């Protein structure tokens, strides 16, 4: 929907119409689509002769969806408030000329990919190289945009290792050839703290591990306001992952991940580990 009111129509009073057919105002973007977590700049064009004398006013019909603020050079910045649809309006200060454009605010669930180990993976992965390194903050999502999500080791691991192993999951080899691990006979429990999550939003956690060994079942326990458990056999694992769905963070926006040998782990050192994790927002 795009409506223009120019020479034959007034935004306020038909008796005050400026009949010059040379004068116009127009939003350059006939429709605007943006995510809830981003802003957008829109611009307006006015006729060349009188443009400098026009003072433009910007507004949105529903301020519960977005707000708009005029800036220099006949532009305005839109800030989303909530998912929904509304209309942008620009008008001259005298109310004689105005123009409308559609605005749609959407929310695409964020997904973050994390690769554990010293060999970096390309985007969209966030690379956590060593369990003794500082944690990751403002991780990039699948679109390459910063998020509020962070991850840090809060229960130590034995270390990291690289075995050069491949996968059949479509992941880069760099994601499957290195990992964080622990020998359970020395470190029976390892884990992460995931921060910056949104209260009231549920998340899915997906894990992948691969080692050329035997009996390395790993238990993943994800804990927020609720919790879930999954078991993954890492032995020669080219294509198996596990998911824990529907996890809601605690009141601080935090989820804890605890890892330990699974009940069927018979590896001599009680080896357990993880190569990659995928953190996904679930749609409401």
PLM regions: where:
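Extracellular carbohydrate recognition and processing domains
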Residues: 227-249
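Short, surface-exposed beta-strand/strand-loop-strand elements in extracellular ectodomains
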Residues: 209, 213-228
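A short beta-strand element within beta-rich, extracytoplasmic domains
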Residues: 190-192, 199-213
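Extracellular recognition modules
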Residues: 87-91, 206, 258
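Low-complexity, Gly/Ser/Thr/Pro- and Asn/Asp-enriched, turn/coil-prone segments
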Residues: 108-185, 246-284
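Surface-exposed, short loops/turns at beta-strand junctions within beta-sandwich domains
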Residues: 80-84, 198, 249-251
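Extracytoplasmic soluble-region selector
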Residues: 12-109
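C-terminal motif of bacterial Sec signal peptides marking the signal peptidase cleavage site
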Residues: 7-10
